[in-house]
Amino acid sequence: MIRLLIIDNHDSFVFNIVQLLREHPRVTYDLIREDELCGDEMTRYDALLLSPGPGIPEEYPRMMRLIAEGVGHYPILGICLGHQAIAQHLGATLHQLPHPLHGHPAPLVDIDHSDPIVGGITEGSIVGRYHSWVVSRADLPACLIPTAYSEGAESEQHELMAFRHRQYPIFGLQFHPESMITSSGKAYIEGFVSEVEKELRAQSLSLTTITSQI
């Protein structure tokens, strides 16, 4: 059973995420508000999910600390603000859209079908966008692999909608899988759960190998 910590970044959408996980047979979870984090939470959990939220990542210093501590140590999925926070911590920049998007349906394009989170999604599947900032694709750090884009809201340039870390089980989704607008929303969460399970199996195998050599 996966022990998942969900960070509530003061956004009502977090309860839709909880609804997706509430009856999941392989996940137990706790929900903690970002401003109530005390610093030792991840000693009790296997993976971290960062919720959407208003504002920009630097307004959430405790979430940013968890990301800094987590890279290379536990799986992370960031949604919307969480996606932006992971990218910014790893060296990406954000740029502001000309007009905020709220409940904007958009098709996913250029999907990386080898990706464990978005790879099983059909090209052109609709996702719900609720954001006024986006991760800049121009200077995306080399450690992040783009895995899906969306048609630009007000330009012909496609905007980054998903990424994964090149080395670690760290993933970002700019859109909201928990939105009713998003088709196959559960599939994105299930993809992350499967990746966490894969990571836990690898850790267990590594520990068994080390123990047998002692």
Segments predicted by a language model, with ranges:
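A glycine-centered loop/beta-turn motif at secondary-structure junctions
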Residues: S155-L200
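Short histidine/acidic/glycine/proline-rich micro-motifs that form metal-
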Residues: P54-I56, V134, E178-M180
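N-terminal beta1-alpha1 cap of cysteine-dependent amidohydrolase-like domains
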Residues: M1-G72, I79-L81, S183-S184, E190-I214
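Generic structural signal for residues in well-ordered beta-strands
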Residues: T28-L31, L94, P146
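Catalytic beta-strand/loop cores that center a nucleophilic Ser/Cys/Thr
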Residues: S114-Q167
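Histidine-centered divalent metal-coordination motifs
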Residues: C80, H131, H176
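Cysteine-nucleophile active-site neighborhood
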Residues: Y45-G120, G124-I126, I189
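Short loop/edge segments at beta-strand edges and connector loops
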Residues: R33-E34, Q96, R129
